[in-house]
Amino acid sequence: MKKIALTALAVFSLAASAAYADVVKVGVIGPFSGPFALQGKNFKAGIDAYMAEHGNKVGDDTVEVVYRDVPQADPAQSKALAQELVVKEGVQYLAGFYFTPDAMAVTPILKQGNVPMVVMNAATSSIVTKSPYVVRTSFTTWQTSTPIARVALDKGVKKVISVVSDYGPGVDAENAFKAAFTDAGGEVVEAIRMPLATNDFSPIMQRIKDSGAQGVFAFLPSDPTTLGFMKAYVDNGLKSSGIQLFAPGDLTQESDLPALGENALGVLTTFHYAVSHDSPENRKFVEEARKAIGNPAELSFPSVGAYDGMHVIYKMIEATGGKKDAAKAVEAVKGMEWVSPRGPVSIDPESRHITQNIYLREVAKADDGTYYNKEIQTFEKQGDPGLKAQ
């Protein structure tokens, strides 16, 4: 009987210590190996930069980040890892998610696990509609693809062909650009959706030339595919023939610019963040994030989504006193406003999506020979038009 009583006491003690633990774990799922490892590296750089600046404590609670690797889009693996993080690791927050399908797969477990999800990259608009416990600190493809339609028209381009990768964000990009472009009087002469695995773009380039379009709107996921597409755009004579290229900023992320080189010069994109953004907050962030990532040339946009994601999570921890309460945590950040390295931002209280400036950028060459995204126009306080289109 005494042994049973002691065992029961031990179990109760463990449960009590878990309930009042002063360590709050954040589980981050992202690509930390494989072809998209640089994006996961940027997640970690942004998180490390935030914690270097703000410390690892919120009140009396110590914040611990636990990472899990999903090298490529894999919804089943992402869901399994999220369940493992919640059940075995005891994380109170899930974050990261570079790929939309991975984020979508995890949303069903949020309510059951009583954990919020902070999306640091995945850009399909509808993610936030899948659970009231989702908050996004990155961007959506609708948000970054809509303003570039106005830019194309201002450049005198009336006929455009759309070329996107055939998955959630690509379809969002196609729809966003078409809606804004046609509403303003432009014509999308053809819409091409390419398999994600496409690596030979020559046939696509021929279709673009044959279409009679004055410009091409393109969306591909950052990293290997963008390099091949941009090279084909130049090698097949589209750039030299005056067919202008317009895109959201995924196409010219900073870590790709050394490889893109002269091919990218003059390309116009609209995006929520450039490493070159001129503000005190960004200069401070870039200094810390470059230390964290090791190679300054590798710093890119997922880092700022992760940095701001940690800012939101710290606010959630503060609001809940370190206790596990997803509803209270999310409620605490609705309407939250702050000055991010990217500029002024806020969390929309209805959609739980980030409202932010979108910048028109042109790829330029600095005096030292490096390439960068030069901001030349600001579209202020952009919400997510994609949610209205659902």
From Swiss-Prot:
Key words of the record: Amino-acid transport, Signal, Transport
InterPro entries per UniProt: BCAA_transport (IPR051010), Leu-bd (IPR028081), Leu_Ile_Val-bd (IPR000709), Peripla_BP_I (IPR028082)
Signal peptide (UniProt feature, chain positions): 1-21
SUPFAM superfamilies cross-referenced by the UniProt entry: Periplasmic binding protein-like I
Gene Ontology terms: biological process: amino acid transport
Keyword Signal set for record: yes
Top-level lineage group: Bacteria
PANTHER family, per database record: LEUCINE-SPECIFIC-BINDING PROTEIN, PERIPLASMIC BINDING PROTEIN OF ABC TRANSPORTER FOR NATURAL AMINO ACIDS
Function according to Swiss-Prot or TrEMBL: Component of an amino-acid transport system.
Family of this protein: Belongs to the leucine-binding protein family.
Protein's UniProt name: Leu/Ile/Val-binding protein homolog 6
